[in-house]
Amino acid sequence: MVSKDSGRCILTTPEREVEPAACLALEMRYALDPNRQIKKRNKALQVRFKDICEAQNEQRDTQLSSGPLGEKREAKAVSCRVAYRKYMTVPARRSIPNVTKSTGVQTSPDLRKCYQTFPLDRKKGSLKGLPAADAFKSQNNGFLADSKEKSEAGPMEEPRPCSAGRIHKTTALVFHSNEHVNALGQPSGVNCAELCKSPDVLGYPEAVLQNSRPPSEEPIHQLQGRAKLDRGTLDSEEPAPLTHGRVFKTEVATVYPPAISTRAPEPGLSNSAAASQWSLCPADEEQRRAAHLNGLQASTGSAVACSTPVQYLSPECSEQPLQNQPSPTAGIGDEEHQQIVPHTEVVDLKAQLQVMENLISSSQETIKVLLGVIQELEKGEAHREGLSYRTGQDTANCDTCRNSACIIYRYVNILFPLCYSE
């Protein structure tokens, strides 16, 4: 009998030990459930607030029933403070949501859509995010790609045969206006014997090329007759593309490095290496001859006439005749080049300053809005805790306020001298 009882006790003891362990595991799992915790916390908040209100009412009733009027008021204030202090010191106050972290309201517009940050985007295509770029359509600020230059030439121009090998230096600051066409290019060729068959490659007929002797070797009446003849042939052959203006080749040294020539270039050519090497239009021919006839520029020495068409040569052979060919429009090209380049640089600086001003003002407005939101949140928190809230930041009068602790004041002092220091 004893053995049976002891055996029964041995068997039943593990069962009794397993049951509390399973119950404890279930309770822990149930207690660690986040939804369960949130429900318990909300319930505790409701019960605690209800108990506090009932306690306040009980204290108020007991004090109103006995005692004079002044003591009643003082006791009422003390009871309210005690109850509020008790309510605020309970650890479950952590369940009150943090408004500054939980609210994801966007109080300011997205600045990326309105303004582009610096440095400017130099990808192929167009300038992104520069609102002032369209105001200066007549200037090429060096960031536009080859497609932009082709579109500026207009639909009048047909695709040219040798346009596959044209050399462009778009990142160099090449300035031209809307009526200038990008006819500055050279067809690709392997050796010097290859010539382009079509005379329309650079928009320059052979009649002008044969007349490339310097004006000093021709009489005046031949010059006038030849100018009329050139104008007539050009009007009959190409009426549309040659109505454009002068083409400048501004950075010759970086695009085409000069070859060592057998003959030294003339003094008139040395001053115009960066301005204009040759002219491509009948208006330029007329200007050249008019300048020579009026005595604006005297050609010194004898020039070497080009026997082969200079513009149809490959890039290897086209450098030497360029230096040997005289350029009577050197002084005029220099003047126009000096007039255009500083003007465009000033325009680009103005556009960049305008964009920076817009960016700074929008950022300042954003800071004002965010400061207002922060102040409202802090004021609400202070009123909930029974404190008085006072701030030294007056965002409504930012222009007149000079509070050194304000972030807007520091922001303006740091950024605006950067813009207007010059």
Curated annotation (Swiss-Prot):
Interacts with GPHN. Pfam families: FAM196 (PF15265). PANTHER family: INHIBITORY SYNAPTIC FACTOR 2A (PTHR28682:SF1), INHIBITORY SYNAPTIC FACTOR 2A-RELATED (PTHR28682). GO terms for cellular component: GABA-ergic synapse; postsynaptic density; postsynaptic specialization. Component of the protein machinery at the inhibitory synapses, probably acting as a scaffold. Inhibitory synapses dampen neuronal activity through postsynaptic hyperpolarization. This synaptic inhibition is fundamental for the functioning of the central nervous system, shaping and orchestrating the flow of information through neuronal networks to generate a precise neural code. Residues 344-370 form a coiled coil. The keyword Coiled coil applies. GO terms for biological process: chemical synaptic transmission, postsynaptic; inhibitory postsynaptic potential. Keywords: Coiled coil, Phosphoprotein, Synapse. Residues 146-160 have a biased composition (Basic and acidic residues). It comes from the Eukaryota. This is Inhibitory synaptic factor 2A. The modification Phosphoserine is found at S177. Its main location: other. It comes from Mus musculus (Mouse). Residues 143-163 are annotated as: Disordered. It is found in: Postsynaptic density. Belongs to the INSYN2 family.
